[in-house]
From Swiss-Prot:
Glycans are attached at N54, N89, N153, N236, N301, N316, N358, N417. The gene is HE. This is Hemagglutinin-esterase. Its main location: virion. The active site is at S40 (nucleophile), D326 (charge relay system), H329 (charge relay system). It catalyses: N-acetyl-9-O-acetylneuraminate + H2O = N-acetylneuraminate + acetate + H(+); N-acetyl-4-O-acetylneuraminate + H2O = N-acetylneuraminate + acetate + H(+). It comes from Bovine coronavirus (strain LY-138).
Length: 424
């Protein structure tokens, strides 16, 4: 009880000396159990293979290159590897997961399945995909890719229907129409299998619009049926538009099992790759660094849309990306954000990372870790410390209860002692 005024006094003295402990705009970790997924801006192998070895190409401090805690690939992203033939097997595990990738699939690439398609739909797909990845990596330690085997009993093969520039979609796969079918009004099925992981992220996609082929319009219809549990997942085309639509994808989180892919109209699609989620962990928010181009190229904000508290903290620079190696590699602002990976930090919040766990002038929003006591520390001529009143109220209640108990005990013993003297 007598220590409280001293604590407040010491805190005020600290405040008068300028101690503030604000949240910092970095990504960091509580301890050594962390992992980063990235692209060329954190791809140490890419830099090693350039001549000369110019580490200004990266936003990552080269001291982390031998940490064994980075899975990055120049020119790629997790979304790009998930859907397209341009594939890198991102693999990593940690309690605290950080993502700094996504820029290698943006409006700059202008991808769309057909000439009359829509890149806006693919940006929507990107946002939905990363939402599932971020949410699930807050509760899983391990991420990697796995192939999804499937069995189709017809003679038709998969076809590269959806492609643009150098990007060719191969997940999900399109099964071409059988030669004996005169149109796309038919039902067809394929078996596929998920095994070896705790859960999987798989795509379920349709053309949401009137798909034209040989003067006929078709409504896409795709389903996945879990033959072990009887659960069915499905999408049907609901739009009446004939141009400006594209491949709308939902990203399902499925358990291991035997599945049936079913198409009631148009082409059958079946997943060929999945994100493999393994090793459940205590809830730990992921951290995402904005992945964007210099303003000379068009970027998107889909990773920011996907990264929402409480499962995700988003970090961004307030200025244009201007690299020192070239305009898209080696930006000082993003290098500063990644510098937090060089040290441990006790507390994470929506506003940033706190370097100390004692007091702060900022109340941590969606805090995780050992976070500072809320305090508003000011520095006028006479320092004033205004602390969060809740702990003081609770302390007062506890002290009041303790006083009542002591008084009751004293009265009890006094009455009991008086009774004994009277009896004597």
């Amino acid at each position: 009880m007598f220590l409280l005024p001293r604590f407040v006094l010491v805190s005020c003295i600290i405040g008068s000396l300028g101690f503030d402990n604000p949240p910092t705009n970095v990504v960091s970790h509580l301890n050594g159990d962390w992992f980063l997924f990235g692209d060329s801006r954190s791809d140490c192998n890419h830099v090693v293979n350039t001549n000369p070895r110019n580490y200004s190409y990266m936003d990552l401090n080269p001291a982390l290159c031998d940490s064994g805690k980075i899975s990055s690939k120049a020119g790629n992203s997790i979304f790009r590897s998930f859907h397209f033939t341009d594939f890198y097997n991102y693999t990593g595990e940690g309690q605290q997961i950080i993502f700094y990738e996504g820029v290698n699939f943006t409006p700059y690439h202008a991808f769309k399945c057909t000439t009359s398609g829509s890149n806006d739909i693919w940006m929507q797909n990107k946002g939905l995909f990363y939402t599932q990845v971020y949410k699930n990596m807050a509760v899983y330690r391990s991420l990697t890719f796995v192939n999804v085997p499937y069995v189709y009993n017809g003679s038709a093969q998969s076809t590269a229907l959806c492609k643009s520039g150098s990007l060719v979609l191969n997940n999900p796969a399109y099964i071409a129409r059988e030669a004996n079918f005169g149109d796309y009004y038919y039902k067809v099925e394929a078996d596929f299998y998920l095994s070896g992981c705790d859960e999987y992220i798989v795509p379920l996609c349709i053309f949401n619009g009137k798909f034209l082929s040989n003067t006929k319009y078709y409504d896409d219809s795709q389903y996945y049926f879990n033959k072990d549990t009887g659960v069915i997942y499905g999408l049907n085309s609901t739009e009446t538009i004939t141009t400006g639509f594209d491949f709308n994808c939902h990203y399902l989180v499925l358990p291991s099992g035997n599945y049936l892919a079913i198409s009631n109209e148009l082409l059958l699609t079946v997943p060929t790759k999945a994100i493999c989620l393994n090793k459940r962990k205590d809830f730990t928010p992921v951290q995402v660094v904005d992945s964007r181009w210099n303003n000379a190229r068009q970027s998107d904000n889909m990773t920011a849309v996907a990264c929402q508290p409480p499962y995700c903290y988003f970090r961004n620079s307030t200025t244009n990306y201007v690299g020192v190696y070239d305009i898209n590699h080696g930006d000082a602002g993003f290098t500063s954000i990644l510098s937090g990976l060089l040290y441990d930090s006790p507390c994470f919040s929506q506003q940033g990372v706190f370097r100390y766990d004692n007091v702060s002038s900022v109340w941590p929003l969606y805090p995780y870790g050992r976070c500072p006591t809320a305090a508003d520390i000011n520095n006028p001529d006479v320092p004033i410390c205004v602390y969060d009143p809740l702990p003081l109220i609770l302390l007062g209640i506890l002290l009041g209860v303790a006083v009542i108990i002591i008084v009751v005990l004293l009265l009890y013993f006094m009455v009991d002692n008086g009774t004994r003297l009277h009896d004597a």
